[in-house]
């Protein structure tokens, strides 16, 4: 079971995570298209994702996740960002989140060691469960983002004169 406290900590730290992710997206050699996205827009999208992570991670196949990431895909298509860069943006988000959890001791803080033989196994199980759910969430997000991108691409192609 994922600790609600751990998700809460991620959401609380969304501001600093947002800055790190937005900086990486706008400077990473694999995502040059994101340099054309206004910094405020990029930061707002990343912040909303991290801030709502707790709601979304429990049900990654929800309509809200589909709506958010489909819109993100459509918008990025409209901005002319290649799909490969958008896919890599999701990878960057996931990497930053996992690194932040690890580097800032959020797991230890959320699962304090008390006493008894069962603390460590529960600690490891919770970490593994969180890691699995983060992966599942980003897999679904990537799917919906790609669907939104493709839908916008199809609309764009259909509206062009032949």
Positions of the model-derived regions?
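N-terminal low-complexity or simple alpha-helical regulatory segments
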Residues: 2-84
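Long, amphipathic alpha-helical coupling/dimerization segments that relay conformational signals between
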Residues: 65-162
């Amino acid at each position: 079971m994922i600790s609600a406290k751990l998700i809460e900590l991620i959401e609380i730290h969304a501001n600093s995570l947002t800055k790190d992710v937005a900086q990486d997206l706008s400077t990473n050699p694999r995502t040059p298209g994101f340099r054309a996205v206004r910094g405020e827009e990029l930061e707002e999208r990343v912040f909303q994702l991290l801030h709502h992570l707790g709601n979304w991670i429990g049900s990654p196949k929800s309509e809200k996740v589909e709506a958010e990431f489909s819109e993100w895909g459509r918008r990025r298509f409209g901005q002319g960002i290649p799909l490969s860069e958008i896919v890599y943006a999701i990878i960057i988000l996931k990497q930053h989140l996992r690194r932040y959890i690890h580097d800032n001791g959020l797991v230890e803080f959320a699962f304090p060691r008390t006493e008894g033989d069962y603390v460590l196994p529960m600690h490891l199980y919770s970490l593994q469960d969180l890691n699995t759910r983060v992966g599942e969430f980003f897999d679904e997000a990537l799917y919906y983002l790609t669907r939104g991108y493709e839908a916008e691409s199809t609309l764009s192609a259909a509206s062009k004169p032949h």
